[in-house]
Structures are given as structure tokens and as C-alpha cells.
Amino acid sequence: GGLMRHTKAAIRIAYELLENKTIGGNFSSDQKYLMLFALLIHDGLKSGIQQEQYTRFDHPLLASNYVKDNKDKLTLNDEEIKFICECIESHMGEWNVDYNGNEVLPLPKNRFQKFVHMCDFLSSRKFLDIKFENDEIVE
């Protein structure tokens, strides 16, 4: 569906940018993997932990908390968990205020968080016509 395509597009955009030496050369291998992991799961709880009818505005916080709650099942250290969670929490960028004007989500602060936001943002732009066939990106 649409969410899976969006996630695949975000990851592909990130991968292509990170493979570019001018852009990707500014990140270590570990940083690249952690940003890709954050993109893989950034919208995983978009409809809540229990499937809800509408998108949860706080879904980045739900996903981040899910990672923290399940960190013992991962082979990541505390610093890596923090890195991933901060990228997930801030992936919405400037769309961090709820319908009542409350600032719910943090803004991206560092280059890693801004990179994850950029890839998420670009994958949602309709003018970037990423072709899919059977939910797979077509070259």
C-alpha cells in the first residue's frame, strides 16, 4: 500500500544520497545504517499501537518509545538507540504542531535528524514520480 511505498521511497532516496561520495562521505558507515534503520521504522506506528482509524499525530513518539521499550531485543547500544529514536521523533520536521497549536514533536536539530526528515519529506512529494510495480521500485 501507500505507506509501504512511501517507506521504500524514503529508504531508496536515503540510500542513493548516502552512496554519493559528496553527500554520503560526510557520514560514517554506522551513521548511515542508523539513519536507514530510522527511516525503515519511522512510520511503523502511524495508526497507533492498536490499529486506529486515523493517523496518530504523535506516531513518531510512539515509534521511538516502541524502540526504547524493546531495546533488549536489539543488538544496539544505548547511544545508537538514542540516535535512532531522535531521528524518528523529529522526522516530521516543521509539521510538529498539533491541531490545537501545541508543539508535540521536536524539530530536527542535527544533520542526522535533518537528513532523515529530508528523505521522508522528499518521498512524500508527488512531483518526484517514483515508479512502482507490485510494490517494488522500478529502475
What are these regions (language model features)?
Residues 17, 53-54, 131:
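Single-residue recognition of alpha-helix boundary sites
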Residues 28-52, 63, 88-92, 120:
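His-Asp-centered metal-binding catalytic motifs of divalent-metal-dependent phosphohydrolases/nucleases
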Residues 25-26, 75-138:
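Histidine/acidic-rich helix-loop-helix segments that form or flank divalent-metal centers
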Residues 13-20, 43-50, 69, 94:
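Amphipathic alpha-helical interaction surfaces
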Residues 1-34:
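Alpha-helical phosphate/pyrophosphate-handling elements in metalloenzyme active cores
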Residues 7, 11-14, 34, 59-98:
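Histidine- and acidic-residue-rich, metal-dependent catalytic cores
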Residues 1-9, 49-62:
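Active-site metal-coordination segments of metallo-dependent hydrolases
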